[in-house]
Amino acid sequence: MIKVGIFGATGYTGVELMRLLSKHEKVKIEYISSQSYAGKSIADVYPSLTGFYDISLDDVEVEKAVSKCDVVFTALPAGYASKIAREAVKKGVKVIDLGADFRFDDYSTYKEWYGGEYDGYDGIKRAYGLPEIYRDSIKEADVVGNPGCYPTSVILGLVPLLKEKVIDGNIIIDSKSGISGAGHSPSQKNIYAECNESIRAYNVANHRHVPEMVQELSKASGEKVSVVFAPHLTPMTRGILSTMYCKLRENLNQEEIYEVFAEFYKNEYFVKVLKPGAYPSTKNVYGSNFCHIGFEVDKATGTLVVMTAIDNLVKGASGQAIQNMNIMFEIEEKAGLDIVPVYP
């Protein structure tokens, strides 16, 4: 059995890890932490887990977690995971960070967008945790930086096109996210009266996920990619629908675009390329680790419109983290994740 610890178990991504791992046959959770609920049973904090776990929350105790676990998930604010990772790696414990500490190729980008105290990247064998692109690197890594939710939806939709030089590098992205993407902590903007029957844009052209997108899309393209990103919060609990507007380099039809996607993802269980004319919906991936991809060619303007749908808490966070864990420990990649989406 793989012995697992979770730092930050009472945030949305932490409790989603526990939900998904409850059916993982090769995992046992040995340690969970919460600064807000230390000493309480996880089932008292989240009654949805009643009967699945008999474990109480600790305060953040790195030495204790490392002594009991083979791998730890960190779902903490920026800067914390790097400190935990250094101690864990010394003891041979693997780390999967659901925050931003290990997403970037260079520390300066992280510092510019996230700030805070940070131990840096030196001496840590790490990988960017998008399995469909970096599976081999993930397998060899001690620390994996789980991608952000928006970048996951965007990168999966665009990498095949950029690698095959189908589109140019000036891309406009419009993303709609469920309220859970704003996190567990309450704020006036996220209460029911503010969110219900309302969609609002936020951090347009200045969202912290932009440099992550640019980094990965530029690597796929082989040249610098320019991204204009407009995120929105919508009155639903889960899900991200990203719509990407790209200029075609040549006059390709629907069937040719489909073949580019189908060939790239032919061996990827969690990415489903929809047939031409079918568009993705967040409802059809709800509660699952799947990404659905659709597209449309606007012949009048030479624009390719790409659409992706994911569950922001699963493929956009905790499910993808478990997928990375499975790869790191060389077990079936679908373990704990082979779940039919919830419908309706």
From Swiss-Prot:
Pfam families per the UniProt record, alphabetical: Semialdhyde_dh, Semialdhyde_dhC_1
Main location: cytoplasm
Domain of life according to the entry: Bacteria
EC number: 1.2.1.38
Signal peptide: none
Keywords carried by this UniProt record: Amino-acid biosynthesis, Arginine biosynthesis, Cytoplasm, NADP, Oxidoreductase
Pathway: Amino-acid biosynthesis; L-arginine biosynthesis; N(2)-acetyl-L-ornithine from L-glutamate: step 3/4
Function: Catalyzes the NADPH-dependent reduction of N-acetyl-5-glutamyl phosphate to yield N-acetyl-L-glutamate 5-semialdehyde.
Protein name: N-acetyl-gamma-glutamyl-phosphate reductase
Source organism per UniProt: Caldanaerobacter subterraneus subsp. tengcongensis (strain DSM 15242 / JCM 11007 / NBRC 100824 / MB4)
Name of the gene: argC
